Amino acid sequence: MREYVIRPLVIGANETDQGIMTYLRGYGQRIWIPIYAFYLEGGPEKILVDTGLEQFMVPPEVSKKYGLEILEFEDALATVGLRPEDIDLIIHTHLHNDHCENDTKCTNATVIAQRKEYEFFKNPHPI
């Protein structure tokens, strides 16, 4: 069986209300949440799980406070020796914008998502 190493890449951060992330706790408190993509290293294909946010602004004190180096997509890939066009396969956990905004930069990649997720993405519920 093939062994992979999972390399987390912090590609963006979102500021949100804590209550959205911690059910019934912390409503009204603003928190920063890192947005991750994961590079699966070890096989013949260059595989990413999610691609993160394309554009974001994170105050420098946030990176320092949480001890995270939050990088643009291309810079994050460079930390593992890759460029967007090197990616062969993108696997999506789901199709929220903070998981798939950099897909179009991976011009040689095949993109995989669950069928139901894709159907909803193409025809969302009207609000």
State where each predicted segment sits.
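Active-site HxH/HxHxD metal-binding segment of metal-dependent hydrolases
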Residues: K46, G52-I127
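Extreme N-terminal starter segment of soluble prokaryotic enzymes
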Residues: R2-R7
